A protein has these predicted regions:
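Membrane-proximal basic amphipathic "stem/tether" segments
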Residues: 1-63
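Phosphate-binding site of ATP-dependent enzymes
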Residues: 31, 108-109, 132-181
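A short, GP-enriched loop/loop-strand-helix hinge that lies immediately N-terminal to
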Residues: 57-70, 132
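Short catalytic/ligand-binding loop motif for oxyanion handling, primarily in non-cytosolic enzymes
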Residues: 78, 101-104, 120-125, 134, ...
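Catalytic phosphate/metal-binding cores of nucleic-acid and nucleotide-processing enzymes, i.e., regions
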Residues: 94-98
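Acidic/histidine-enriched active-site and ligand-binding environments that engage anionic O-linkages
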Residues: 103-114
Length: 181
């Protein structure tokens, strides 16, 4: 009943959800125009964008550089930052793998953070390997390995990022350390 009630309360959100289910059928321009109207209730001004949101849509459509793909990849961007300003500004990486099953947990320290390289928000923090729930971590990360972040909002730099998992040094001072365990 919860989803049905949400759809009744906010029909635009229900339409947006249904629209995203057909996301592969639309050109980038068509998709962004329709999604923009659903979210903001007005037509997207592509020719002379004024608002921040319109300018972001314009950038998605017309400002494409191949280096952006390396910049959104959490593993590849470490190389760029190291080359440009030095490795002191990069959180140390313990490894990169194509699947969860390839991770060599015995070689990782007691505390670490696992992240997907190709999206935003898919991470798992391990504060103690003895208490680490590998099954839950695997379910969360592998679910996200099969998503292509590009399709939801047409942020094309994400389209060709190879989905992988990295292990990084756990840095509790960065952000909310208790948000995922």
């Amino acid at each position: 009943m919860g989803r049905f009630q949400k759809a009744l309360d906010d029909p635009r959100a229900a339409i947006a959800w249904a629209f995203r289910k057909t996301q592969h059928m639309w050109s980038d321009e068509q998709y962004l125009k329709i999604l923009y109207r659903l979210f903001y209730g007005r037509k997207l001004n592509r020719k002379s964008p004024v608002t921040y949101s319109e300018k972001m849509q314009w950038l998605k459509l017309y400002h494409r550089q191949t280096v952006f793909t390396r910049m959104v990849d959490k593993y590849e961007v470490k190389k760029i930052v190291s080359e440009k300003i030095g490795s002191d500004y990069v959180i140390p990486c313990y490894g990169v793998w194509d699947s969860f099953d390839e991770i060599e947990f015995d070689k990782l320290p007691n505390q670490f953070c696992l992240k997907c390289t190709h999206d935003s928000g898919s991470f798992v923090i391990c504060k103690d390997k003895k208490m680490f729930d590998k099954a839950a971590a695997k379910a969360r990360l592998e679910h996200n390995l099969y998503k292509n972040f590009f399709y939801e909002f047409r942020e094309w730099p994400y389209k060709d990022v190879k989905p992988r998992i990295i292990a990084e040094k756990y840095e509790p001072s960065l952000g909310n350390a208790d948000s995922e365990e």
